[in-house]
């Protein structure tokens, strides 16, 4: 179910588009000046390097801006955002979290708008600091952040904001002959997630020059990070007007021209079908809607924290140095303000860490509780997020009781157990799912405790929404698997099930149309000895889908398969089955639902 934050995003759209006739810049007869030289780093600023070699860490203002927690926004919605509050959080970040790798202080939406959301622009259609929120302007704020050895981040919505258009006569900085009429489409078509801006027309050279002028302004101010929001395809918008790939490309080009290494993060709920574009032109991309609940706390488990368990797997393969899958803020620092149980807070932080998401908190850093500090500063957990280990993915298809894993370069495995159910439950990580049998040494990452040696599996009783995080080091033996192709003529297809082409599949074919009674039965699955087997299922599924798995006509187990990136990408999970010595059947049944397409199964040779 989609997060209830979406209607609140709509309310923000109303705020963004309210009073469109106010604060519109008049045409300014200004002679364009030469572009400034690349901005030098302020004293105390971290050394420049290529952005996003690791998932970034820091703080964002939006979680507190968007919350109705008592006292956070005393002057109306989103009023938390002020120079005083930003610098207070920067001071707390430097004192408490900087030594653990947190370094970005990111100013989100509204820095150019007053408490009634009336905007400020300079004489060149660029956002300007609201004097009530940021009386000294934005450069002194960045300078103060740099003086603490931190990096400064800022925010913009994509497109030319409607209020900045000024009848089309506003001159573009350092672009002789260009006005706002020359940067947009002549029909003033709108764009972004709120339709609060006119879409830029990059077939017109002035559009790139407008982006260049904004990027140079941020570089001159000393900003190190830009969040570009409302980007599509995504942000709950589709169609040509909301395709902002050209905007993101223009921003990448403009940032490069400034000579300043500015991290470009794009948002929100971006379309995975354009992931190649996001990777090419940006350093990070929000894969989902806001994590905030827009309620009396910062977040809630059901709002959208739990959505990430469904949405993150299909993006995992795309994360790499230079660009990361952004799951949004980690609001785990103060239980009362966050609105989560301790178990939920640990699961939240665990998923973000193993998924290699940027780690940026939206909490009030001056009010962190002891448990929140322990979550945000656990060096072993941070090392998983910041190290060379690839993002973890689910290795089992088991619904609310999930096992995620990533194999480390030293042969060990990062393994997370999650119970997403509303009641307590046991969760088991079976070594077969990790590719070996026998013994393994298990270390509890959160508690920094060696738990000893476990044979074949580890099982933990977890509370509702609880988790455990382990490093599992095999001491047993690896094994081979015997593969059985779905399209084999020895199999039995029932209902609508049919064989289709699949270029990514192992045999270039798959079995699909497994819906509403469609079944695929693998025949003559041979094992030497009877017992419990974790069978690999390679499948294709553009969204998370259920299926029922059974062997030899026995009772079926209902399972849920995580989404793959699209309907052309193959992923693999393991499913538990009981087999007898000799020949067996394994059946994948859609039941009354829609199941994934199947490439093949692979059975351990034990």
Regions found by a protein language model. Give the residues of each.
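Aromatic-lined carbohydrate-recognition surfaces of secreted/lumenal glycan-active proteins
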Residues: 150-165, 252, 256-273
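Secretory targeting and sorting signals
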Residues: 1-36, 40
């Amino acid at each position: 179910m989609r997060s209830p934050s979406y209607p609140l995003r709509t309310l923000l759209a109303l705020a963004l588009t309210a009073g469109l006739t106010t604060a519109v810049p008049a045409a300014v007869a200004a002679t364009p000046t030469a572009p400034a030289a690349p901005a030098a780093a302020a004293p105390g600023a971290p050394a420049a390097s290529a952005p996003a070699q690791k998932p970034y860490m820091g703080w964002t203002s939006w979680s507190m801006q968007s919350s109705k927690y008592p006292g956070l926004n005393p002057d109306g919605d989103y009023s938390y955002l002020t120079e005083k509050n930003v610098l207070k959080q920067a001071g707390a970040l430097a004192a408490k979290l900087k030594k653990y790798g947190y370094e970005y202080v990111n100013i989100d939406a509204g820095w150019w708008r007053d408490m009634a959301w009336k905007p400020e622009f300079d004489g060149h259609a660029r956002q300007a600091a609201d004097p009530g929120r940021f009386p000294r302007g934005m450069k002194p704020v960045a300078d103060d952040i740099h003086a603490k050895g931190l990096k400064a981040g800022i925010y913009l919505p994509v497109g030319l904001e409607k209020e900045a258009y000024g009848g089309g006569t506003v001159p573009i900085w350092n672009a002789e002959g260009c006005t706002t009429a020359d940067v947009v489409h002549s029909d003033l078509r709108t764009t972004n997630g709120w339709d609060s801006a006119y879409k830029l027309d990059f077939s017109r050279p002035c559009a790139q020059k407008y982006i260049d002028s904004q990027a140079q302004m941020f570089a001159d101010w000393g900003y190190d990070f830009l969040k570009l929001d409302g980007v599509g395809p995504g942000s709950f918008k589709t169609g040509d007007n909301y395709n902002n790939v050209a905007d993101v490309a223009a921003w990448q080009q403009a940032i490069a021209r400034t000579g300043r290494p500015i991290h470009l993060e794009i948002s929100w709920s971006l379309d995975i079908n354009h992931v190649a574009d996001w990777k090419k032109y940006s350093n990070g991309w929000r894969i989902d809607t806001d994590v905030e609940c827009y309620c009396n706390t910062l977040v809630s488990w059901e709002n959208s924290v739990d959505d990430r368990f469904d949405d993150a797997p299909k993006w995992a393969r795309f994360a790499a140095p230079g660009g990361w899958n952004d799951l949004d803020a980690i609001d785990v620092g103060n239980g009362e303000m966050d609105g989560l149980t301790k178990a939920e807070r640990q699961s939240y932080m665990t998923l973000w860490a193993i998924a290699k998401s940027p780690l940026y908190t939206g909490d009030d850093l001056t009010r962190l509780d002891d448990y929140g500090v322990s979550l945000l500063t656990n060096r072993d957990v941070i090392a998983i997020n910041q190290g060379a280990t690839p993002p973890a993915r689910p290795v089992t298809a088991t619904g609310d009781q999930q096992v995620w894993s990533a194999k480390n370069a030293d042969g060990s495995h990062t393994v997370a157990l999650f119970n997403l159910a509303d009641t307590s439950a046991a969760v088991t990580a079976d070594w077969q799912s990790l590719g070996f049998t026998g013994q393994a040494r298990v270390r509890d990452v959160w508690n920094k405790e060696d738990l000893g040696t476990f044979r074949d599996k580890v099982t933990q009783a977890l509370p509702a929404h609880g988790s455990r995080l382990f490093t599992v080091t095999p001491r047993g033996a690896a094994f081979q698997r015997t593969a059985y192709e779905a399209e084999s003529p020895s199999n039995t297809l029932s209902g609508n099930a049919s064989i289709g082409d699949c270029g990514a599949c192992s045999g270039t074919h798959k079995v699909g149309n497994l819906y509403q009674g469609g079944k695929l039965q693998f025949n003559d699955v041979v094992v030497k000895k009877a017992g419990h087997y974790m069978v690999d299922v390679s499948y294709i599924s553009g969204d998370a889908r259920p299926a029922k798995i059974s062997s030899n006509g026995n009772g079926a187990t209902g399972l849920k398969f995580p989404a793959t990136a699209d309907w052309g990408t193959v992923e693999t999970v393991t499913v538990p089955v009981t087999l007898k010595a000799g020949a067996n059947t394994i059946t994948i049944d859609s039941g009354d639902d829609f199941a994934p397409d199947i490439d093949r199964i692979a059975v351990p040779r034990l």
